[in-house]
Swiss-Prot record:
Gene: TCP17
Localization: Nucleus
Organism of derivation: Arabidopsis thaliana
Coiled coil: none
InterPro entries, sorted: TF_TCP_subgr, Transcription_factor_TCP
A UniProt-annotated Pfam family: TCP
Protein name: Transcription factor TCP17
Function of the molecule: Plays a pivotal role in the control of morphogenesis of shoot organs by negatively regulating the expression of boundary-specific genes such as CUC genes, probably through the induction of miRNA (e.g. miR164). Participates in ovule development.
Length: 242
């Protein structure tokens, strides 16, 4: 029982160290990042934690994963680094380039070189690998949230506003940034119309030259009598479509 508590305490300590690791930087789309995946700080600056492999290298990694019976391809890299630990230890430590600490003040406490992962014991590295899987799962959750927010913002920014009867002196509101592309993509199935009800509500129809400038001649069937007529005014469709 005491051993289990010690393991939990050690795992919590490693998790805290990982979240507070100054070499891990999270980039969010909300703050201008192209993607939201975490990046790692290296002697060459921030680098994406995801590494692109050549075709042949990817095949070898997947084959080795099957032969080792590992659950994830990334564990193959961990295994290779573990096997090569003695050779890696013979390499000179990574040195910070001149001016590195000025550009990365949060890393000033690391000394003259980056701390190595191999300085941890095997049990600690295994616990760290467990936390890494949790981190990856958390990344997937944030991916889903970012995708949902991006989709919602896209819908809001691409809304089309058409003539709306708000009072006896109604005005026309247009947001035609993507209208022509929408018409092209949906092959004329867009449910938009300038209703003929303006005759009954003292509304002035848009001028023919205005409509011609908004809709090119590639949609000749859409133009008639100076107004857009995708369906007749007797249709049950509403006048305001969003």
């Amino acid at each position: 029982m005491g051993i289990k508590k010690e393991d939990q305490k050690s795992s919590l300590s490693l998790l805290t160290q990982r979240w507070n690791n100054p070499r891990i930087v999270r980039v969010s789309r909300a703050f201008g990042g192209k993607d939201r995946h975490s990046k790692v700080c290296t002697v060459r600056g921030l680098r994406d934690r995801r590494i692109r492999l050549s075709v042949m290298t990817a095949i070898q990694v997947y084959d080795l994963q099957e032969r080792l019976g590992l659950s994830q391809p990334s564990k193959v890299i961990d295994w290779l680094l573990e096997v090569a630990k003695n050779d890696v230890d013979l390499l000179p430590p990574l040195q910070f380039p001149p001016g590195f600490h000025q550009l990365n003040p949060n890393l000033t406490g690391l000394g003259e070189s980056f701390p190595g992962v191999f300085d941890l014991g095997r049990t600690q590295r295994e616990a760290l690998d467990l936390e890494k899987r949790k981190w990856v799962n958390l990344d997937h959750v944030f991916d889903h949230i970012d995708h949902h927010n991006h989709f919602s913002n896209s819908i809001q920014s691409n809304k089309l506003y058409f003539p709306t009867i708000t009072s006896s002196s109604s005005s026309y509101h247009y947001n035609l940034g993507h209208l022509q592309q929408s018409l092209l993509d949906q092959s004329g199935n867009v449910t938009v119309a300038f209703s003929n009800n303006y005759n009954n509500n003292n509304l002035n129809p848009p001028a023919a030259e205005t409509m011609s400038s908004l809709f090119p001649t590639r949609y000749p069937s859409f133009l008639g009598g100076g107004q857009l007529q995708l369906f007749s005014s007797t249709s049950s469709q509403p006048d305001h479509i969003e």
